[in-house]
Design a protein with these regions (language model features):
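Short, flexible coil/linker elements and helix-boundary hinge sites characteristic
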Residues: 7-8, 64, 152-156
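Interfacial loop-to-transmembrane junctions
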Residues: 108-109, 146-180
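Functional transmembrane core segments of multi-pass inner-membrane proteins
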Residues: 14-141
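Compositionally biased, low-complexity repeat tracts
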Residues: 3, 71, 78, 159-161, ...
Length: 182
């Protein structure tokens, strides 16, 4: 199997890479929805997997199928830039939001997850995931908030309501946007 993957069959390589990336994104989404935490073993570990795969499968970033030295270095460099630029951008967005909101606006797990996404998708995929995740989160959460407001009104305890100021995990929306990009 490994020889087939390294041998240059693009369809098998893409399937292999897609399965690994989708698995990481699904696992992270489920854990983040249940616990509001993203474990480092998946975010940082996923970043390391993305960097490694970019070295051995430069096709991940659109380079030649043949495992030649220049393509391998270019794939690794593209992955590294994606990791750094994506996570840095989200860090600064979170820092600016914290300044205005006077409270934590974004978890560190989301920043590390975006590094993983950048390692697999490049910096363009990371930027797409930030804004795509924000749009998906908004589009999917507004109906939930409206239905809850209509159905529950003031009968539901304050700590169980969705609404402004209630923490909503961003990781699943980042993951959905990343999978759309990938």
């Amino acid at each position: 199997m490994i020889l087939l993957l390294i041998g240059g069959n693009q369809d098998l390589q893409n399937l292999f890479l897609s399965m690994i990336f989708a698995s990481i994104m699904i696992i992270v989404s489920v854990i983040d929805l249940e616990t509001m935490l993203i474990p480092d073993r998946f975010s940082i570990g996923g970043s390391l997997v993305g960097l490694s795969l970019s070295l051995f499968f430069p096709v991940l970033h659109g380079f030649s199928l043949s495992p030649l030295q220049p393509e391998m270095i270019a794939g690794l460099w593209t992955s590294f830039l994606g990791l750094i630029i994506s996570s840095s951008l989200l860090f600064w967005i979170g820092s600016i939001a914290e300044t205005f909101l006077k409270k934590e606006a974004l978890g560190q797990g989301d920043i590390k997850l975006l590094g993983c996404i950048g390692a697999f998708c490049g910096w363009q995929g990371g930027v797409f995931s930030i804004f795509g995740g924000a749009i998906l989160g908004t589009v999917l959460m507004i109906p939930v908030l409206v239905v809850q407001k209509i159905r529950c009104g003031k009968d539901q305890p304050e700590n169980e309501k969705f609404g402004w100021g209630v923490e909503i995990p961003f990781g699943p929306f980042l993951a959905m946007a990343a999978l759309l990009y990938f």
